[in-house]
Amino acid sequence: MIDMAVTVDNPVSKVYSIWSSEIEKKVGKGNYSMSQSGTLASNKTKYARIFMMGNPTRDGDLEGNECSTIPAFQVDSFAKGTKALSEVYAIDDVSHKAMVSMGFRRSYGPELLENSDSTIKRVVSRYSRVYTGYLPDETK
């Protein structure tokens, strides 16, 4: 009998579920996604998106089992209209708290970046953490 190598499950669905439940309270239903499309935010006054940048193996054992990975995510926050600058940072703050609650640390940002539509303010933050298959408060 051949033992199958154990791998750490990709956390993208868990992270998106927790992040989206928090961010929806700030930006509204349907104003967030996992899409990297640059046009989704153009017709909205508040919008946020998250996407995985990678999930490389961090540790493995001699049998080939994957013991931990380092998932990395980017979160883009968008706001348009009056007080867009303060609003975009408020969206980023809600997102940041959701990511930190899952054990992620901000590795970049929050940085205000130029957007193709100058009426839309955009803030980018990136996060990573060591992941062993469980987020905080999950049972093994």
Predicted regions and their residues:
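Small/polar-rich, solvent-exposed N-terminal microdomains that initiate assembly or binding
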Residues: 1-61
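Long, highly charged amphipathic alpha-helices
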Residues: 14, 18, 90-97
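Short, conserved charged micro-motifs
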Residues: 82-90, 136
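A generic structural micro-feature
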Residues: 42-44, 65-69, 117-121
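Short Gly/Pro-enriched loop/turn and capping motifs at secondary-structure junctions
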Residues: 55, 81-82
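Short intrinsically disordered coil segments
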Residues: 64-68, 90-93, 139-140
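Acidic-leaning, charged glycine-interspersed low-complexity segments
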Residues: 93-140
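Oligomerization/assembly interface segments of phage tail-like spikes and tubes
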Residues: 67-81, 121-132
